[in-house]
Amino acid sequence: TVSAPEDWSVHVPLDHSGEGWIAADFDALVDSPVHAGSLEVRHFRVLDHQHQLLLIGAPPGGWPPSFLDDVIAVCEATCRLMGTPPPAADRYQLVLILLENGYGGLEHDHGAVLHYSWAALEKPEGYRQLLQLIGHEYLHQWNVRRLRPAELRPYNYGSAVISEGLWFAEGITSYFDLALTLLAGRSDRPTFLADLGDELSRVQLTPGRRVQSLSDSAREAWVKLYKATATSRDTQVSYYRLGAATAFCLDVRLRRRNSSLSSLLRRLWGSHGRSARGFH
């Protein structure tokens, strides 16, 4: 249970029972962020699954009238990408926190918490990048939360878990998040190609790509990527960005053989994701 002032609302992505919430186990408990306050709450459905959007903060000019429809379109496009009519989670809570400066998100089994810059929303590309971030975290319902490297399950809370598969988890997702606004009808092909070109250019302009391999970038994430130094750019490369570039190359190669990376991801979901089997 959560005790809060009467004029506050409390939101937890768990099954509600009476005056509180029920977690199936410790993993589910610590994976469920609690938000309480005078929050703007919007409810919507994606292919008949209940979704909740919590908004903490707002752009100076307010949210565009199309915002909720745009979010729904990106979510539905993600489901189509995965070839599964319903989302992977039976309920989903999306939390968006606006700050003066910020960018990022963290996925959970039944939702995600994002932070983003309200200043960035003043430009069209900033709004598009927010939708891409939402798509990125939404896709993690499948790729990461349920389809994941074997070493990430069961959870080990006592030490850092080392996995070369992080590049697949985040790189594949980063590649597809660029396409989700296109698939959702919220951007066009030239814009997608421009965004992809920018992402590839960032990799090309990172000297560290000649020093650190993609698998090493993933394996050394906790000791290098998240502990940046003045020389990091010259000695390291992000497994997100190099992973996305690698995903693009894989997609092109597969398409030349009458397949695609999305088809591969759907096959992996069927063979390893639905059953929560980790992959190697």
Set out the residue ranges of the language-model regions.
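Intrinsically disordered, low-complexity linkers and stems that provide flexible hinges
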Residues: 1-52
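Acidic/polar loop patches that form or flank catalytic/metal-binding clefts of enzymes
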Residues: 10-11, 87-90, 150-151, 183-193, ...
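Juxtacatalytic substrate-recognition/specificity segment
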Residues: 40-166
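Extracytoplasmic/secreted proteins, especially bacterial periplasmic and envelope-associated proteins
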Residues: 66-73, 77, 129, 133, ...
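Active-site-adjacent structural elements in folded domains
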Residues: 97-100, 157-160, 219, 225-236
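Post-HExxH zinc-binding segment in Zn-dependent metallohydrolases
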Residues: 112-121, 146-147, 158-209
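An acidic intrinsically disordered interaction segment
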Residues: 130-145, 195-220
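Amphipathic alpha-helical substructures
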Residues: 190-195, 222-280
